[in-house]
C-alpha cells in the first residue's frame, strides 16, 4: 500500500489528473458546490494519507480550492511539490500564514486544512484516531468562527480491490 501511495503521489505531482478521473467516485460533491454558492467560504477538513495528493487534485478539477501546506526541507522535493500545487490549486498557503487562510475564507474560497498534525501540546489535543490517541490541532473551530466558513469533511481512499478511489464530502 505504501508503494502504491508513493506512485499515486508522484503521478499527481507530475501528470494531469483529469486523464485518470474515470477511476474516481465523488460522493457529496453537491455539498461542496452548494456551500461554495453561498460565498461564505468552506473549510475542507481532511487528513494526511497516501491518497491525499491524487484525490485532492482530482477534486480540484471539479471545484477549485486552496491548500495549506508545510514547506519541505528537501529543496528538490519542495520544487516538485510547488509546481504540482501551482498546477492543481488556485492558492497554496503555508501553514503559518493564518491571515491569508482567514482572508481567503472570508472571500468565499474553499481551503483544505489538515488538523491531524502535532504542533505541540499548546496547539493540540489528543483524541482517538482509529482507536489510537493522536495529536490533533484545535484551530478548526476558531477558523470557522472567525471567518464564518462552513466546515466540510473531505475523506479519500483507494478501494480495497484497487479498482479506483472514493472521495467523500460531508454535509456542512
Model-flagged regions — what are they?
Residues 1-43, 78-89, 159, 167:
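Membrane-anchoring hydrophobic helices of lipid-metabolizing enzymes
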Residues 31, 96-101:
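Short acidic active-site motifs
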Residues 73, 110, 117, 121-172:
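A cross-family acyltransferase "interaction/gating" segment
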Residues 28, 46, 115, 171:
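Pocket-edge structural micro-motifs
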Residues 5, 38-96, 121-130, 158, ...:
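Catalytic core of membrane glycerolipid acyltransferases/transacylases, capturing the structured
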Residues 40-46, 109-113, 149:
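Generic beta-sheet signal
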Residues 27, 96-97, 135-139:
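Short, conserved clusters of charged catalytic residues that mark active-site
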